[in-house]
Amino acid sequence: MPQLVLASTSSYRRALLEKLQLPFITDAPETDETPHAGEPAEALVQRLASAKAQALAGRYPQHLIIGSDQVCVIDGKITGKPLQYSTAVKQLQQASGQCVTFYTGLTLLNTANNSINCTCETFDVYFRTLSQAEIDGYLLREQPWNCAGSFKSEGLGITLFERLAGRDPNTLIGLPLIALTQMLIEQGVNPLTVKPVE
């Protein structure tokens, strides 16, 4: 089995990939994540997921490299990680009572034969109407500065929602495992037939 490389330093993506019980390593890709002018969210996340995987290709021949990138769209505008409290407040104020769509790009690059598979998964988050006290209380408790959309759905962020809609809930956290499993099987790596990590 070719070794897997997760082109990410995200602890969330690492924890998701561990669910598949396959051996893998992580490495930080050097990529410019600046959106191109007028670039749609779907194209942006697919381009960045591919760029992350390809950034590590020279270091990992004969490997399967997984790249992923995520943005959310609030009121038609691409939104990324807030990085600070004031931006997170604005993002949650904009999301209050709205449907926010998350776009997660996923790439699997086989450096042995240079084949590449790329897709985009979407996931809709319907926010309930939030008071300023709820927004402040949430942000002070969870501090989601490195999370697109300013929340952690796997934590207290679940209290912000009215409902969720999408094919794979892992997509919302940053790594679409259903799509990734399909890509891995196409490359001859089936999580159910490979010896699991102990």
Curated annotation (Swiss-Prot):
Residues under site feature: Important for substrate specificity: Y12, Q70, E154
One term under GO cellular component: cytoplasm
Gene3D superfamilies noted in UniProt: 3.90.950.10
Keyword Cytoplasm included in the entry's annotation: yes
Keyword set, alphabetical order: Cytoplasm, Hydrolase, Nucleotide metabolism
Chief location of this protein within or outside the cell: cytoplasm
Active-site residues, as the UniProt record annotates them: D69 (proton acceptor)
Keyword Nuclease: no
GO molecular function: nucleoside triphosphate diphosphatase activity
EC number(s) given by UniProt: 3.6.1.-
InterPro entries in alphabetical order: ITPase-like_fam, Maf-like
Biological processes, Gene Ontology terms: nucleotide metabolic process
Pfam families, per database record: Maf
Co-factor requirement: a divalent metal cation
Family of the protein in this entry: Belongs to the Maf family. YceF subfamily.
Function noted in UniProt: Nucleoside triphosphate pyrophosphatase that hydrolyzes 7-methyl-GTP (m(7)GTP). May have a dual role in cell division arrest and in preventing the incorporation of modified nucleotides into cellular nucleic acids.
Full protein name: 7-methyl-GTP pyrophosphatase
Organism of provenance: Yersinia pseudotuberculosis serotype I (strain IP32953)
